[in-house]
């Protein structure tokens, strides 16, 4: 596992399942998409402190920060987790199924994927239709 990014292996799915949106944005740069994605996540994950936004975020750095933020939400802000998920627009049914079918160790990873997928769609739509 990479010492700089301990979540690199965990988020191997990111390049295959979220980043394809980038191919649909030929006139916009991947870097712009990633900057907007990171900013959207930082905004929507309140009360978790995201930290400083990167001038040049990578998919891996976003994934690592997101995994940490989700873990903090689960451990320290569990009563506001539902509000965050509602604000991001992840269905209650989807979350219930995820929680019931996933081991506690994998919940933050699966939940992070749901958040990332939804936020990436939101950013992609804004970039494509504004």
Q: Predicted segment positions?
A:
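Conserved phosphate/pyrophosphate-binding and hydrolysis machinery centered on Walker-type P-loop NTPases
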Residues: 27, 31, 52, 56-60, ...
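Amphipathic alpha-helical interaction modules
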Residues: 40-83
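Amphipathic alpha-helical binding modules
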Residues: 95-130
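Amphipathic protein-protein interaction modules
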Residues: 67-109
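N-terminal leader/targeting peptides and immediately adjacent processing regions
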Residues: 1-42
